[in-house]
Amino acid sequence: MSSPERDEGTPVPDSRGHCDADTVSGTPDRRPLLGEEKAVTGEGRAGIVGSPAPRDVEGLVPQIRVAAARQGESPPSVRGPAAAVFVTPKYVEKAQETRGAESQARDVKTEPGTVAAAAEKSEVATPGSEEVMEVEQKPAGEEMEMLEASGGVREAPEEAGPWHLGIDLRRNPLEAIQLELDTVNAQADRAFQHLEQKFGRMRRHYLERRNYIIQNIPGFWMTAFRNHPQLSAMIRGRDAEMLRYVTSLEVKELRHPKTGCKFKFFFRRNPYFRNKLIVKEYEVRSSGRVVSLSTPIIWRRGHEPQSFIRRNQDLICSFFTWFSDHSLPESDRIAEIIKEDLWPNPLQYYLCREGIRRPRRRPIREPVEIPRPFGFQSG
């Protein structure tokens, strides 16, 4: 082609993008394709060994124009088969394919080699991507191993022995039943507390009226104590005389019945001690141990009672010793008898004067083992 032909209608990119064989072999930025090796150099593979990676066809146009401008010449035209190859749209497609292969093989670094080696890059791209995928999969495996080592991922044993299976089958129903039983017990406790508060208010009214009447009966509590088949053994010497000054007895449970109870003995003025109120309290601590506390008795001079009375080589506890000595083995038993037997109905023991018993609609209560509501253990 001549320069007038370019001016008449030949597209600029098609004419200016062509170069002759010398330009192709000497340009560092241009790598001939496999189909144009012989057409460009005529020397086979030896003439194009060491050519660097190709660039865009469009990128060659400004370089050729700049080189021609420096030399003062017009851009050279390419003739022959090479020109046909360059002009055809197939070259553009091949250039685009080469550019796509280069972008895929960009991460895989290789030294410049032969055209065959450069062509193999596009073929190696697929295995290279597989290698990259394999490398990316390794951290996932390491994470799984770390999770398994830390106990995050555990596989259930495929075959569990019948022994472990039997234990689980026996344990789970028992746990479920126990949970249901605990729920029922909690509901019962709440209902009991509600009823206790409701009927406690009703009982309080009658107890106040009963105490008011008993205060006007001289020696009521002394008679009730002496007529009780179990408490009468403790009334010794001056105990009966001191009990004559008891005006009122109150037994109160603490906030919750299982936490203990309190005994209050009210006295009128007497020649034996100065106290008008003596309190004996049993309290259940958080550890489960039951301890007893009492008010110290302020004895008048010369009226300190004997702590123990020896009879038949046995130690017998005095009633007033029960207030001060908390280590006596019978101390807890006395508290139970007063709370569970004497206090609910003292009238039945008051009416038993000197063994004379009134006819009753029910049999007389015999001395029996009274269950301990909260397990007294003095400390």
From Swiss-Prot:
Covalent link Glycyl lysine isopeptide (Lys-Gly) (interchain with G-Cter in SUMO2), residues: K109
UniProt GO molecular function: enzyme binding
GO cellular component terms listed in the entry, alphabetical order: nucleolus; nucleoplasm
Subcellular location: Nucleus, Nucleolus
Region (Disordered): 1-58, 97-134
Pfam families registered for this protein in UniProt: NAP
Bias-annotated ranges (Basic and acidic residues): 1-21, 28-40, 97-110
InterPro entries in UniProt: NAP-like_sf, NAP_family
Keyword presence, Mitochondrion: no
Keyword flag Nucleus: yes
Name the record gives this protein: Testis-specific Y-encoded-like protein 1
One annotated GO biological process: nucleosome assembly
Species this protein is from: Mus musculus
Keywords, comma-separated and alphabetical: Isopeptide bond, Nucleus, Ubl conjugation
Tissues/organs with expression: Highly expressed in testis, ovary, liver, spleen, brain, kidney, prostate, lung, and heart. Low expression in liver.
Family named by the database record: Belongs to the nucleosome assembly protein (NAP) family.
